[in-house]
Structure formats: structure tokens, C-alpha cells
Amino acid sequence: MLRALSLFVVGVCANLLVGLTAFAQAPAEVTLTRIDCGSGATPTDVGQRFTDTFAYKDLKLTFTFSCYLIKHGDEYMVWDTGFAPGTSPNAPKVGIVDRLKELKVTPEQVKYVGISHFHGDHTGQLAPFTNATLLIGQGDWDQITSPTPMQGANVAGFKSWIDEKRKVEPLALDKDVFGDGSVIVLRTPGHTPGHSSLLVRLKEMGPVLLTGDLAHFRENYESGGVPSFNFDRAATVASIERMKQIAANLKATVVIQHDMRDIGKLPAFPAPAK
């Protein structure tokens, strides 16, 4: 009788342990929501400055400026913060804080803010995320904190992080943000010294690649032409090639953040991609 009871107890404990292990290992639900963070006031003649190979003559495009909210279980990450309202003709009429409010998310709930690079159209609304850890490429952070930052580095956008000594994680390598492979900051230098892109793995849609300014529009991504203002041409070409290989291997959806034609690859706000 005692032996049977002991075996029963052992069996119950084993089943409970298996159940708890399965529960602990259950993947967090991941969603991705695009937030409008500005749009071009006028079309841009991209054949002048956005290629060094004469790849697209007389091509004019209207740029868009995108921010993103990633929900990982009960945790949140923001990717890029666009222009601040009122700071540019391209700035959004509604700021990111108010957009997050529509999603019932406060800035204080955001655990990470990832920045593709230090330009003002990606860093204009950093200040409200007081509890977040800033994820930024090492090369870009070095410029932001340099006594003589390079032209185009939006030092003012990072003022609160520097003055208040907020949490910063400069990235010299790729970063698995939540530790389960679902959200990875990818090193894609070239546009700036520490430029990064983002991989988000979604259960239904599959992997999504957010390019930052690795490429500014589809023709830029496909032709191999490099904007004249990029920091490093060779690094840009290598990073684009890396992105193409990742996209092919993972069968990922590539979202070029400035290309208005790519907005429709994700659900319209406030709906998330899942």
C-alpha cells in the first residue's frame, strides 16, 4: 500500500513538474504595431542624393517616418521615435505618447527604446521614456557623447539620457532583446557608424525586418546604390547584403521604414501584426 502511494505521489509530482516546465517555457506572445511619426511635406528628388550609381533618374518619392511598438508578453519596446510634433514640416500632428495612449500604453511601461541611428527623424521623441533602457549602436553612441559629434548626430534628442544618466546599452554586437530570439537588434552599419535594424519574429505573419535607414526606399535597397551622405559606402553595401540574406533565409517581410509603399505590409494603426 505504502509503495503504491509513494509511486502515486512521485507520478503526480513528475506530472506537475512537466506542467510547470512547459508553462515556464511557453513563448511570449509578440505583436508589432506601426505608429505614424511623420510624412514628407513634398516629394524628394531621390536621384540627386540617394544613389551614387545613377540608378534612378528623375525618381521622386514622398517619404514616411515610422515608429513601432513591440509587445512581448507584458513587456514593451519602442523602435525609433520619429520627429517631435511641431519641429519640422514633416513632423506628425499627433505625438507618439498620445498614440501609445490610444493603445493603453504609457511611456513609463516601455522597457526598451531601440534606435536605428542618431538622426533627428528617428530620435525626436526619446525624452518621455523615462524607465526605458536605450538600445543604440556603439558607433552612434560614441558620436553622441563625443566632444565633437559628427554632422547629423542629433545630440539634443539624447539630452535627457545624458543629463539624467538614464540607462543606456551601447551595442557592439547583435542584441537578443528579450532573450528568446523573438526580437533582435541587428548590426547594419554604414548609413551611420552604429546603424542598426530590427528583426521581429511574429507567430502568424512570420519574421519582419525593420530596416531603419539601411535603405530609404525599395529601389535603394534593390539597386545597391548608396546615398552620398552615408558614413561608409562599403559597410552600407555589406549591411544590405546581410539583410537580403537574412530575409531570404528566414523568408522575412522586409519593411523599409521611409518607403510609403511599405506601410501596407503591416496592419493599419491601431491594429497590430501578430
Range-by-range predicted roles:
Residues M1-A4:
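Positively charged n-region of N-terminal signal peptides that target proteins for export
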Residues S6-G19:
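Bacterial N-terminal signal peptides
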Residues L20-V105, Q109, S160-D163, L173-F178, M205-G212, A248-T253, ...:
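Metallo-beta-lactamase
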Residues D80, H117, H191:
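Conserved G/P- and acidic residue-centered "switch" motifs that form tight phosphate/ATP-binding loops
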Residues G86-T87, G95-I96, G137, G190, ...:
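Short, electropositive alpha-helical surface patch
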Residues P89-I136:
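Active-site metal-binding motif and surrounding structural segment of the metallo-beta-lactamase
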